[in-house]
Design a protein with these regions (language model features):
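Short cysteine clusters
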Residues: 97, 115-116
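His-Asp-centered metal-binding catalytic motifs of divalent-metal-dependent phosphohydrolases/nucleases
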Residues: 119
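N-terminal pre-ligand scaffold of iron-sulfur
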Residues: 28-98, 102-107, 139-154
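Glycine-centered flexibility sites
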Residues: 13, 66-67, 101, 127, ...
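N-terminal secretory signal peptides and thylakoid transit peptides that target proteins
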Residues: 1-20
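Exported/periplasmic cell-wall-interacting domains
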Residues: 114, 122-152
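Metal-associated gating/positioning segment near the N- to mid-region
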Residues: 109-113
Length: 154
């Protein structure tokens, strides 16, 4: 009886260790779909005083769920990444990592934003840190999609 209990505990520990190892390896994996987020088509958006308005019919980089694009207007200090994770949803966040200020990319297969720096901080689409070393969440901006337009409130 003692030996079968020992076997069961040993087998359970090995199984749990295997599951943990897979999860740890996933966290540190270097996704192949990293670092290729395009800039949003310049003629597809206008910058107003307190918002950016995107004409979705003129923005093929956001045409399909799982796509993302950058908006960069340095003279207004606007640096965003827009992600369309699902057919009816969009998110807009700061495009720079809170650890070292490096550019982020959307990793579609994992539904995460990844820092393009060596440390690869990962962020959830709500801006929270999924894996550091990033010390704080990303700034998130309110978005509204209606009548073929996406409005991002700054």
């Amino acid at each position: 009886m003692n030996s079968s209990r020992r076997k069961m505990l040993k087998s359970s520990a090995l199984a749990a260790g295997g599951l943990c190892s897979c999860r740890i390896l996933d966290l540190f994996a270097n996704p192949s779909d990293c670092c290729n987020t395009p800039d949003l088509e310049p003629k597809s958006y206008t910058v107003e005083k307190d918002r950016v308005v995107v004409d979705l019919s003129a923005a093929p980089s956001l045409a399909h769920p799982g796509h993302a694009a950058f908006i960069s207007v340095p003279e207004r200090e606007i640096e965003l990444i827009i992600v369309r994770p699902d057919p009816d949803s969009y998110v807009a966040l700061s495009r720079f990592c809170t650890h070292g200020g490096q550019v982020l990319s959307y990793v579609r297969q994992r539904r995460l934003l990844q820092c393009n720096n060596f440390n690869h901080s990962l962020f959830e689409l709500d801006g929270t840190v999924y894996k550091g070393p990033a010390p704080k969440p990303l700034a998130r901006f309110r978005v509204e999609a209606a009548a073929g337009e996406l409005t991002i409130y700054l």
